């Protein structure tokens, strides 16, 4: 929580007011990521095969914990798709732990598909890669060959409850969030 002095309470000689300072609400940035499963090959160009809304952490210096809220808004593919998050600029040696709040049970079940390791983060390489889910349809309760289009328009099955995954990354050493925010690399994968 940031606290700012009340308007007009700052003077050249410094802040010396006895008034209670104003509380400033921290606003989180929300971005949408839309994926086409055939990229870079030609596809149907609708960019609805996986649609994620992502709430990013607030900016700041010396941050030791990053919290992301990821909503799976639509699934427009009829094949198994998973999604992951690579965070460029965070060495895995600096990661104390990655844990999950809401959506953790569905995430774990969907990782049995084999697209990603069934772990908090991938063990290969030096960069932090977090599997978000291994099967978008499984997240919404579809199994086997059941792969309907979800929440993509008139001919699809509407979603009444949107799946949300909360991802918490705890670091050993503090970092600056703006550099990490620029390094986000959301991606999709399939078998």
Where are these regions (language model features)?
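Extracellular distal adhesion/interaction modules in secreted or cell-surface proteins
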Residues: 1-191
């Amino acid at each position: 929580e940031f606290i700012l002095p009340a308007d007009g309470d700052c003077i050249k000689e410094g802040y010396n007011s006895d008034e209670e300072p104003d509380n400033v609400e921290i606003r989180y940035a929300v971005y949408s990521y839309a994926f086409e499963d055939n990229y870079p090959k030609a596809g149907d160009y609708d960019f609805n095969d996986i649609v994620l809304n992502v709430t990013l952490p607030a900016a700041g210096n010396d941050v030791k914990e990053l919290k992301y809220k990821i909503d799976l808004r639509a699934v427009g593919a009829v094949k198994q798709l998973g999604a992951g998050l690579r965070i460029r600029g965070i060495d895995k040696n600096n990661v104390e732990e990655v844990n999950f709040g809401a959506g953790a049970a569905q995430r774990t079940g969907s990782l049995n598909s084999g697209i990603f390791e069934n772990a908090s983060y991938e063990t290969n390489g030096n960069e932090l890669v977090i599997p978000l889910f291994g099967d978008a349809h499984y997240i919404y309760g579809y199994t086997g060959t059941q792969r309907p289009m979800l929440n993509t328009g008139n001919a699809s099955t509407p979603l009444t409850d949107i799946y949300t995954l909360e991802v918490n990354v705890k670091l050993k050493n503090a970092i600056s969030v703006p550099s990490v925010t620029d390094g986000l690399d959301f991606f999709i994968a399939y078998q």
